[in-house]
A protein has these predicted regions:
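A helix-boundary/hinge signal
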Residues: 1-579, 583-596, 600-611, 619-633
Length: 633
């Protein structure tokens, strides 16, 4: 006992409806606290959600978003600043709450509307008209590689964090929270088979709503076989094991754990028992499941992550990928993506110019012609020459733009560019490919950015920029962010994988191989032909054996093997290395050097810790078998 006493003024008590008044009074004589109020908050979170509409209970999050916009003077930020604020501040406000509750679509729509409006227009006070959005929110929430801005969808963030919470309940089943949840909601089952019909809290209802997402992307790697056959996702047909069980047979007892399906004192499937209990089809499936040598409990793995550990970030990516597969995005020209892939990683380009480049290439600028289509009262004519103002006219066809390009250090003649009918991105790509050395990505978009600023000043402030001012501002913007590249930076990134060190085999004899030298090099490689349909990859393994006496490759020994099992490329490389090790053992080699062109695989073998450092969770069975093979020699 610490001897400390609670603060009774800050404490309150909540009784169940079935507690009598006499019992309440008796308890209050011991604990002098007030009754609990439904609107009590703790650390900014409501302790009791009494509203039938959960969005009302969490309406304070919506108010936080609105107040944060006002405090940060959002209207003073350009689009780059708004993007940074959205990604850093706005995304962090609801994180604590999203870990514990699945927000309603209504609440998420209200919050998303704030963020979306803020990105396009900032905060417009006393404006009740719906602002114009030139690109869909789905397009903006795509990754930068896919042509978006990388803003995360709140709905997917919410589900991803709940998936991570559910993962922790299963992965760390000995934690206090996991034990409490199990005792309350599934004392005689697992999270995977927990019933959904029992009375549940908001937290547990949220976990159950995303359970199928977690179940779809986990697997269990078998070591000791201590996993239950009936309520764990250990094989593709685990949910049907009860239906497949042959209750009429009397030769075997009904098994409980996976190890009960192994032969006695071995880690090999008991084919006769499995066939008798569950049928031949079940046996065919189980024979494809690798068994990891060694001791230790079975390992739950999150398949999308190389570490096998689930995180909210990894879960978000999985959900985003699934959503994109169900809702294919609009086709974006290849040239647009190629230009954006040059713009985003270029540290010499200012962030405001980068976001402008995105709006320009994705046709999301508020040009007069685009605004006129939605608001006919706004004229679509150019403020300088009176022609229809779109991107092509504003940046290349207008006489002012032509003069700016020709007077710039690029010395560009717009007449020499391809037809503008093919799209603005074609002209920009042509300048980047065929222009002089001064036509850098940063300079091109800095000039276009200043042309856009000049247009806005003339249209809204009646300020006319000169050609010299446009060029001077563009030069200043382009030079301001030119960061010096440290010498030798690129040389630090090499891709030559080190070979695996010599692998000694103690106790081996060399009598049967006197014609071969001790120093033998075994090159192991795998080839994977990826197919469109999942589970149909074609795998081939090649082994090349070279000794000191081998003068050229044509006289070396070469083995090739086709694998019927479907493997991922990394696991196929590991299988090739394991086959090379088995070949060395079969040849009774004293010393052999195994070589692979896979850096991850080489590092894992040298680390000698397949359980804790497998490199990739799928490598754990192969690496464990490799090390067991070495230890037995």
């Amino acid at each position: 006992m610490s001897g400390q006493t609670p603060s009774w003024l800050k404490s309150s008590i909540l009784f169940s409806k079935k507690v009598s008044e006499a019992t309440k009074a008796q308890i209050k004589t011991v604990f002098p606290v007030s009754d609990f109020k439904p609107n009590t908050m703790h650390l900014g979170h409501p302790l009791l959600i009494s509203h039938r509409d959960k969005s009302k209970a969490y309406n304070f999050i919506y108010q936080k978003f609105k107040s944060r916009l006002t405090l940060t003077k959002a209207n003073l930020l350009n689009h780059a600043g708004r993007l940074t604020l959205i990604q850093s501040v706005f995304a962090s406000i609801p994180i604590y709450y999203m870990n514990n509750m699945l927000f309603s679509k209504k609440l998420l729509a209200k919050i998303t509307a704030i963020v979306r409006t803020f990105w396009w227009h900032g905060i417009q006070k006393d404006q009740h008209k719906k602002p114009m959005h030139y690109r869909s929110w789905d397009a903006i929430c795509k990754t930068k590689n896919e042509g978006g801005l990388g803003i995360r969808k709140l709905e997917l963030v919410n589900k991803g964090m709940l998936i991570n919470t559910a993962w922790r309940l299963v992965y760390d089943s000995n934690s206090i929270v996991a034990k409490i949840i199990k005792a309350k909601y599934f004392p005689y089952a697992s999270l995977w088979t927990a019933p959904t019909y029992v009375p549940k809290s908001t937290f547990w209802a949220s976990i159950l709503s995303i359970r199928h997402h977690l179940e779809k992307h986990v697997t269990i790697q078998l070591i000791e076989g201590n996993t239950s056959i009936w309520n764990q996702p250990w094989c593709p047909m685990w949910k049907d094991m009860h239906n497949l069980l042959n209750l009429e047979q009397t030769n075997y007892q009904i098994p409980d754990k996976i190890s009960d399906l192994w032969m006695t004192n071995t880690k090999e499937w008991d084919a006769c028992k499995i066939t008798t209990l569950f049928g031949q089809q079940t046996l065919d499936v189980l024979l494809q499941i690798p068994l990891i040598p060694g001791d230790g409990p079975d390992i739950l793995c999150w398949k999308p992550a190389s570490s096998g550990i689930c995180s909210s970030k990894s879960a978000y990516r999985v959900l985003a990928t699934e959503e994109a597969a169900n809702n294919p995005p609009a086709c974006i020209p290849v040239q647009v993506l190629q230009i954006l892939h040059k713009v985003w990683p270029d540290k010499s380009i200012q962030p405001r110019v980068k976001t402008f480049a995105w709006r320009l290439l994705r046709l999301a600028l508020g040009t007069a012609s685009r605004v006129h289509k939605k608001i006919p009262s706004i004229h679509e004519a150019c403020s300088r020459c009176g022609n229809i103002e779109d991107e092509k006219h504003l940046f290349f066809e207008c006489s002012f733009a032509r003069a700016v390009w020709f007077a710039s250090s690029i010395g560009l003649r717009v007449d020499a560019l391809p037809s503008l009918e093919r799209g603005l991105h074609i002209q920009i790509a042509t300048i980047l490919q065929q222009g002089p050395s001064q036509a850098t990505t940063g300079m091109i978009f800095s000039i276009m950015w200043c042309l856009w600023k000049a247009r806005n000043d003339l249209r809204f402030n009646n300020l006319n920029w000169s050609i010299d001012r446009v060029l001077h501002e563009a030069m200043a913007i382009d030079n301001a962010y030119c960061l010096p590249i440290q010498p030798g930076y690129e040389s630090q990134h090499t891709h030559t994988p080190p070979p695996i060190s010599n692998w000694p085999i103690p106790g081996a004899t060399n009598a049967a191989n006197t014609h071969m030298e001790d120093e033998l090099k075994i090159f192991c490689d795998a080839s994977v032909c990826l197919q469109n349909s999942p589970g149909s990859n074609q795998i081939g393994i090649g082994i090349l054996v070279l000794s000191k006496s081998t003068r050229n490759v044509s006289s070396a020994s070469f083995f090739q093997v086709a694998i019927r099992r479907t493997l991922e490329p990394l696991e196929a490389e590991a299988r090739a290395l394991l086959l090379g090790a088995k070949l060395a053992v079969a040849l009774n080699l004293q010393v052999a050097t195994l070589l692979t062109d896979n850096q991850v695989l080489a590092s894992v073998i040298q680390a000698r810790s397949p359980r804790t450092q497998p490199g990739h969770w799928s490598l754990r069975p192969v690496i464990a078998e490799f090390q067991e093979l070495a230890s037995k020699r």
